[in-house]
Amino acid sequence: DQKGQVKRVFGGDIPMERPVINFFDRETTDVELKQRLALKALDFLEKDQLVAIDGSSTNLQFAKNIPNGLKLTVLTNSYSIAHACSMKDQVDVIVLGGRLLKESMTNVGETAASQAALYHPDLCFMGVYAIHPEYGMTIPYPDEVSIKRQLIQSSRRVIALVNPIKLNTVSRYHVCGIEAFTTLITDNDVSGEMAVDYRNKGLDFL
């Protein structure tokens, strides 16, 4: 429409596609917001857990805020997150292999996905580019689909730290339905009406 809120498609309207932004630009934007989301997410961590942390700029802030004395094993496909976790005395780090996707600085593809299938994390903190109650989670790069799906499938609980600008948006490639998530963590100023749309799909919306 004239406001750029939706794009017209056959059979109806869907939300405007999110623009593609590379990791390094995302890493330096909305840092305070990402830190607030990260601090909320720390409440889910417990000693001796196996925690999968998918690559994203918000998840990087989460990794940086893991308490130094908390004993964990972190499984990740992100070099930035692996480096942040390596600075924690009690955190062991497992890095999944694969092809480096420079736009997200993550290892992707079938090699990464097949390695991820060997693990069953207690928690998965999934990187989210666009999420919508009807269209689920979508991403701009097709090579990320298999690793994200595998981490979701293998994990007991899937949590997403989501900048409010990503809510009710879509990108190019479908990863999963909204029901794949157990918890969605976002900022406190998200409207109650929007939260209801996600809670109606069975998510804890924090």
Model-derived segments and spans:
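HTH-adjacent hinge/linker in prokaryotic transcriptional regulators
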Residues: 1-52, 63-71, 86-91
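Short acidic/polar alpha-helix capping motifs at helix-coil junctions
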Residues: 2-6, 24-28, 45-49, 76-80, ...
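Conserved phosphate- and dinucleotide-binding cores of soluble alpha/beta proteins
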Residues: 8, 82-206
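Conserved donor sugar-nucleotide recognition element shared by glycan-biosynthetic enzymes
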Residues: 34, 55, 78
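An N-terminal domain-start capping segment
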Residues: 35-36, 75-76, 172-173, 177
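Gly/Ser/Thr-rich loops at beta-strand to alpha-helix junctions
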Residues: 57-59, 191
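Short amphipathic alpha-helical segment that frequently serves as the phosphate-/nucleotide-binding helix
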Residues: 60, 79, 141
